[in-house]
């Protein structure tokens, strides 16, 4: 694969000084190429391995090119590689978070980012549409989920049913959006480039004010009330808090919709634990959003005590310790081993607790978790919202247990981050 990339770079741009794959879940390479006596610092973005994306890779390149042509600070595009499917862009300077920054620096950067969003949202969508930029939203994710679904997924069916029963009126709002907002590099004062445009499309501009609420739990963007007021000032348009909340809920579903199939049947190269962590964390955000909509209090269930060590406890512990490493590939396996170790300790009891909850709801106790998932999905599809206030706490308990099975108690993998209150 790298030899094909090297050949394309040499034939189209110049001699390659360095080509190195980034250690991450998506195929990405960093390249240094000499052209006209200077070194081009490039990034080669490849296709996902675990799902094809709701928009094809060509769509990402198209939107990025159109934005760049209109002065939006995104990396310049150098071209498309047919094999492996990838496109070549500039590497951009700056840092992706606020480590080492003062509060004033962070706020200045965020004000600049909001300015960029406001200017993006003011662009005429007609040239983007004419060039082939799509409309989409969560419906694009649902289409992939329906086409690739491999097993019952009662929580997703519950959430999608809620969205169908409570459609959002965008009141004519439409613009080019990045959707997966909050991803950029900065120099401590200004944004140097907006990054990761794989979800960019034509949609409601308020999608961009909602999506990065989840990433805020990791990055820390500052006070959202202040930022929303700043966006209103910069754009001249009011921020509809109810619409933002609706878009936030819809965006919390995108991980599970995207990775349902990859978690049910992981393809080679899939980062199972990263996908599982993303899904478990954002599923909790989703059920918490529903609880806010419905005014339902949530309480995390008590976890069962660890069972007596099984026959697998010693070899599992040995496996975990053998995989403890900073190497990316070993780290993936280390996390998977710790998940299996924790399941060996309390997994069976968590499954039994889930089935006990279903017995109360259904009036009968399913025999297995598979039977339970199928019965619960059948119930929520037929229920059509009649028992939403009963189902939200039930799903919260199930999702909380699933989240806590990802690793040892208190580990980073089992830590659930709370969203900032923007009400």
What are these regions (language model features)?
Residues 24-33, 38-39, 43, 77, ...:
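Active-site acidic catalytic loop and adjacent metal/ATP-binding pocket
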Residues 18-134, 143-155:
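ATP-binding pocket architecture of kinase catalytic cores
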Residues 2-12, 16, 125-189, 236-238:
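An alpha-helical support segment within catalytic cores of ATP-dependent transferases
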Residues 321, 325-331, 335, 342-423:
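C-terminal amphipathic alpha-helical interaction region
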Residues 291-317:
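Charged, amphipathic alpha-helical linkers/stalks
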């Amino acid at each position: 694969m790298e030899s094909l990339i090297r050949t394309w770079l040499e034939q189209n741009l110049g001699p390659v000084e360095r080509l190195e794959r980034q250690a991450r879940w998506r195929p990405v390479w960093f390249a240094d190429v000499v052209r006209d006596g200077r070194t081009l610092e490039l990034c080669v973005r490849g296709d996902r391995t675990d799902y094809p994306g709701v928009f094809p890779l060509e769509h990402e390149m198209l939107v990025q090119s159109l934005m760049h042509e209109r002065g939006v600070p995104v990396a310049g595009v150098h071209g498309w590689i047919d094999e492996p499917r990838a496109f070549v862009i500039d590497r951009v300077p700056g840092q992706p978070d606020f480590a080492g920054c003062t509060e004033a620096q962070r706020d200045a950067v965020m004000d600049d980012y909001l300015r960029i969003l406001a200017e993006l949202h003011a662009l005429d969508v007609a040239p983007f549409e004419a060039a082939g930029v799509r409309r989409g939203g969560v419906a694009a994710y649902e289409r992939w989920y329906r086409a690739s679904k491999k097993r019952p997924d009662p929580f997703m069916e519950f959430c999608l049913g809620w969205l169908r029963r409570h459609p959002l009126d965008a009141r004519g709002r439409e613009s080019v959006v990045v959707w997966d907002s909050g991803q950029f590099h900065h120099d401590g004062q200004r944004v140097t480039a907006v990054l990761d445009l794989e979800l960019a499309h034509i949609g409601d501009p308020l999608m961009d004010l909602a999506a990065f609420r989840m990433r805020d739990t990791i990055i820390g963007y500052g006070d959202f009330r202040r930022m929303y007021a700043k966006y209103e000032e910069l754009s001249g348009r009011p921020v509809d808090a109810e619409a933002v909340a609706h878009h936030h809920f819809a965006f919390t579903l995108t991980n599970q919709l995207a990775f349902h199939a990859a978690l049910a049947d992981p393809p080679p190269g899939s980062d199972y634990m990263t996908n599982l962590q993303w899904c478990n964390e954002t599923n909790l955000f989703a059920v918490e959003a529903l609880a806010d909509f419905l005014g339902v209090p949530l309480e995390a269930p008590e976890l069962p005590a660890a069972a007596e060590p099984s026959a697998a406890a010693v070899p599992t512990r040995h496996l975990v310790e053998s995989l403890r490493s900073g190497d990316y590939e070993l780290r993936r396996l280390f996390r998977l081993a710790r998940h299996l170790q924790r399941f060996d300790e309390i997994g069976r009891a968590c499954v039994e607790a889930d089935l006990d909850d279903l017995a109360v709801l259904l009036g009968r106790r399913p025999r297995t978790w598979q039977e339970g998932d199928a019965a619960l999905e059948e119930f929520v599809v037929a229920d059509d919202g009649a028992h939403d206030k009963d189902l939200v706490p039930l799903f919260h308990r199930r999702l909380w247990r699933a989240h806590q099975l990802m690793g040892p108690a208190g580990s980073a993998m089992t830590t659930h981050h709370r969203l900032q209150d923007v009400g």
